């Protein structure tokens, strides 16, 4: 794949690079510049624009293309505006320059996650409007903050507000992942993030003595139990070629804390774990298992949640479902090979599904290495432009789904 010269650059690519240069990088994202960008884009495209401040300084921007039948539920195209931090010394180019090399690769934080999809939504809608299309269902595009740090000041709050319910969303699309093969991955559910702190208390004393009932000994037992569970899930994944990473529960020990000096046995120690719980797991039973591991370690061992999501939903992926039939049917017409999976991490889709709206995660990037959150995150302009073509077909198909039972 080769690149066009600057004078020949496709306008969609130019807009993409313009958006990439907006520094919406955590922990201090410039959300104001992003909101202004979408306001101006809405003005140029003749779309409705609504700003919803879900928390001080956290604005959800909603762009709307009304359908011809307002009694039907709408299509929601969601994307987040923030991106993760960078380590500039590990990048070949300035991570916010949107540098394009001679081969057509665009290097910028957010190129894959997920500013490409935001612009693909906009360019798909623009193309359909220019071609004179109208659809029965209203199309809403939501651009939300805070996803990269959990969405607690973004989509989690937005779905609880009357402005969200007024959108009357019947189906949603959100982010997915690149796929290095010829296929396109589509995500119909995701694992639930549980961030757990285990705290162990025991006898303190001088470190020269063989103390009994120490915090470290008991914490060691819990850590061993959890890591043994981790190994069991890893082996289950490795032994079954039909399983993907999102189908099992993962856990990693991410922090160890405790102690004040080399020669003092601490009274308290703690360990932090990041669990990603598969959607078919019995959440109540799994929490009871955590409790059991702590009890087996001895007295004074407890756990608490820093984050806990317990409402995993699965979007149907069979042809009897009208939304899936429209989505997969459009992909089939484009001869795209789909690989339905459970998303291994977490996205804002979980909040959308939790309020009863089916959602699919889809970033149309095949033959592309997965580079989100990585150094030198990049996307080829040809892959990006094909994604615009794909989303144009998908938006048209979804916005044309006939009235469903209960819709008049």
From Swiss-Prot:
Enzyme class: hydrolase
EC number: 3.5.1.14
GO molecular function: aminoacylase activity; identical protein binding; metal ion binding
Active site: 82, 147
Residues reported to bind Zn(2+) 1: 80, 113, 175
Residue positions binding Zn(2+) 2: 113, 148, 373
Annotated PROSITE patterns: ARGE_DAPE_CPG2_1 (PS00758), ARGE_DAPE_CPG2_2 (PS00759)
Any one GO cellular component localisation term in the record: cytoplasm
Modified residues (Phosphoserine): 408
A UniProt-annotated Pfam family: M20_dimer
Cofactors demanded by this protein: Zn(2+)
Major location category of this protein: cytoplasm
This protein's record includes keyword Kinase: no
Compartmental location: Cytoplasm
Comment on bound cofactor: Binds 2 Zn(2+) ions per subunit.
UniProt keywords, alphabetically: Cytoplasm, Hydrolase, Metal-binding, Phosphoprotein, Zinc
Tissue and organ expression note: Expressed in kidney.
Catalytic activity, as annotated: an N-acyl-L-amino acid + H2O = an L-alpha-amino acid + a carboxylate; an N-acetyl-L-cysteine-S-conjugate + H2O = an S-substituted L-cysteine + acetate
Leader sequence segment: none
Physiological role: Involved in the hydrolysis of N-acylated or N-acetylated amino acids (except L-aspartate).
Subunit structure, interactors included: Homodimer.
Family according to the record: Belongs to the peptidase M20A family.
Protein name, as recorded: Aminoacylase-1B
């Amino acid at each position: 794949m080769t690149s066009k010269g600057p004078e020949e650059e496709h306008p969609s690519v130019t807009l993409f690079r313009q958006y990439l240069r907006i520094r919406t990088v955590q922990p201090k994202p410039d959300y104001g510049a992003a909101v202004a960008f979408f306001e101006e884009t809405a003005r140029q495209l003749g779309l409705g624009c609504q700003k919803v401040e879900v928390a001080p300084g956290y604005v959800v921007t909603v762009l709307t293309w009304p359908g011809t039948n307002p009694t039907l539920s709408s299509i929601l195209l969601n994307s987040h505006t923030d991106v993760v931090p960078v380590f500039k010394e590990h990048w070949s180019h300035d991570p916010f320059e949107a540098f394009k090399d001679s081969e057509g690769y665009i290097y910028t934080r957010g190129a894959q996650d997920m500013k490409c999809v935001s612009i693909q939504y906009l360019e798909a809608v623009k193309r359909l409007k220019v071609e004179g299309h109208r659809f029965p269902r209203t199309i809403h595009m939501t651009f939300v903050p805070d996803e990269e740090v959990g969405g607690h000041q973004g989509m989690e709050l937005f779905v609880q507000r009357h402005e969200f319910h007024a959108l009357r969303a019947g189906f949603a699309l959100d982010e997915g992942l690149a796929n290095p093969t010829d296929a396109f991955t589509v995500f119909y559910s995701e694992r639930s993030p549980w961030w757990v702190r285990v705290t162990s208390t025991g006898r303190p004393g001088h470190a020269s003595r063989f103390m009994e009932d120490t915090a470290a000994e008991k914490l060691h037992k819990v850590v061993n139990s959890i890591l043994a569970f981790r190994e069991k899930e890893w082996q289950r994944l490795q032994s079954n070629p039909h399983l993907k990473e999102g189908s099992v529960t993962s856990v990693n020990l991410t922090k160890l804390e405790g102690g004040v000096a080399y020669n003092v046995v601490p009274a308290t120690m703690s360990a932090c774990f990041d669990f990603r719980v598969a959607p078919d797991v019995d959440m109540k039973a799994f929490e009871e298992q955590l409790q059991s591991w702590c009890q087996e370690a001895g007295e004074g061992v407890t756990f608490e949640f820093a984050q806990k999501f317990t409402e995993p939903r699965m979007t149907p992926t069979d042809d009897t479902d009208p939304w899936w039939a429209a989505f997969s049917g459009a992909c089939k017409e484009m001869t795209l090979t789909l690989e339905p999976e459970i998303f291994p991490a977490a996205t804002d889709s979980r909040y959308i599904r939790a309020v009863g709206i089916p959602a699919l995660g889809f970033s149309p990037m095949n033959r592309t290495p997965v580079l989100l959150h990585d150094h030198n995150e990049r996307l080829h302009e040809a892959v990006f432009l094909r994604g615009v073509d794909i989303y144009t077909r998908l938006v048209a198909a979804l916005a044309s789904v006939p009235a469903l039972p209960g819709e008049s």
